[in-house]
Structures are given as structure tokens and as C-alpha cells.
Amino acid sequence: MKKKLINFKNALVLVVGDLILDCYWYSKNYYVVLEESLPIASINKIKKQPGGAANVAKNIAEIGGNSKIIGFIGMDYEGLTLKKLLNHTRIYPDLISIKKNKTITKIRILSEKKQLIRLDFQEKYISKKFNLLYEKIISSLTYYKVLVLSDYAKGTLVNVKKIITLAKKMSIPILIDPKGLDFKKYSGATLLTPNLSEFEQIVGKCHQEKQILQRGIKLVSELNLSALLVTRSKNGMTLFQPEKQPIHFPALSKTASDVTGAGDTVISIIASSLATGYSLEEACFYANVGASIVIQKIGTETLTINQLNTVLNI
């Protein structure tokens, strides 16, 4: 595929899903007290970043696209922090605050580029404001060109079938980063982007390449998908489409420092590409390059359009 400079300045992408505040606590001094077998981490740096669907919106903005993010947050300090982190000229945060819920927060403690432990503060959203969520989606789809549903199984997309139906009526491409053991609820989507582990939870463990290919083709048919993209970390990604041979995109690097947020990078680039007018094959090619860059970084890292173009034109 011919290399060229790309830009997503005209991309308009609506992102809906579970909003997460990602916190990183860095330690330069980590040791274990032998008498108590107690690990001690002296924290010297704290970093906070948008996570989940919020990271998708940020990724789109960082590569030059325009995103609107719709989702739930709690009426708490973490919710306010997440709002501030989404203060970007290319992000329009349309967040719904809920009194009864805390903002979903994940804290990762790291030392020497290794993750020691992750602490999750979360509960599924049970709200009377779902009708407001759907109203916001409907009004937004008259302007935005592509819909991304970022599902982390925290309750925002509890009725994902309804959202898919709404978007299909308006002929809007629907890209979904799926979660859980029920992929049937995503039937009729334009594209699903599970990682290999999520894919195998649905189709069974794949011990050979041909099993991945056969089961991918079958899943596209069973779920009536326009396409399925299985992301495979250091092994790249594989695209399945009805009545077409699978296309494999090898990773640029065979090592992965941290795959956190790589799926967000993939779906962000694909959404921005489709909203700009690129083909799905081109979009996946760009996404594979972007993911290969991001997995070399630690944490929920975003990619810039300059970084992407630099690697594309090496």
C-alpha cells in the first residue's frame, strides 16, 4: 500500500460508552519486607488520564479528528477530574452526572516499567437517565459521521441493541469495541474489534492460524457483521469481511511493552479514517501502524498524527 501523509481534520466521530479515570502511581523504590512478605512501593509520581470511552475520544482528538463523547460520570472529585482532562479543542464532552454512582476509576501502581497491581473502583451504572443518553445520541447522529461504542461492561451500553438500531436507521457506520461473553447483542454492527483473548472467549481457544481464520469467517456470518477485526498484539491484526478472503496486517514490532489502551488506538484510527473517506482496508492498515507504536509505551498512551505519519513514511 502506497505511503502518504494523512490527516483527519474533517473527521467527525461520536463516541458513546463507559468513561473511566485512569490513574498511574509510579514508584522508583519497590521492595518486599521479608518478615511479613509485604510489598512496599514508595510513590514518587502520579499521573491521571482519560480511560475507556474517554480515551477513545482523546485518541481521536490527538490524531487531529473531532470527537463528541457521551457517557456517565459520578458527582465526585474523580468525575470533575475526568471532565478537566477532556478539555480539548477537538473534544466535545457531553457527560451525564449521576448522584448514586461513583466515577469508574482504575489505579495502576508501576515500578521500573512493570505494573505491580491494579486497583479498581467501579460499579455498574443503574440510572433513570438512560432515556437522556439515547436522546443525546439521536440528536448527535444528525451531525457526526461515525459512531464508536466503547463497551467495558460497566452498564452504559446495557441496551446496545437499541443504539445499534438507532444508528442503522440513520445509515451511520457503527464501530464497537466489545466486552463479555455475549456478542449476539452486537449483531448488525459495521465492525467489531475484539482482541484475540476476547475473540477466543466467544469461538473457543485457537491453537492454529487456520482455526482463527475459519472461526472469524463464521462469526462474521453468525452476527451479520459488515466486518470483524481481531487485534493480536505483537502478531498484528486480522480483518474478516463477508465473501472476502481474510486480510492479515503484521505488527511492525514483535515486542509489546504494554498493550493498555491499544484497542482504543485501533478503533480511534479506524473511526477517523472512515469519517474522512478512507476505505476499511486503508483504515485497518493505519490502525495497525498506530497500535504498533502505542504498545511500545507504558500506560494509556495516545498517539499523535505526526507520530503516525512519521512511521508511515519511513
UniProtKB/Swiss-Prot annotation:
Organism domain of life: Bacteria
GO CC term (a single one): cytosol
GO molecular function: heptose 7-phosphate kinase activity; heptose-1-phosphate adenylyltransferase activity; phosphotransferase activity, alcohol group as acceptor
Record keywords, A-Z: Kinase, Transferase
Keyword DNA repair in annotation: no
EC nos: 2.7.1.-
CDD domains: RfaE_like (cd01172)
Family (UniProt): Belongs to the carbohydrate kinase PfkB family.
Protein name (database record): Uncharacterized sugar kinase BUsg_057
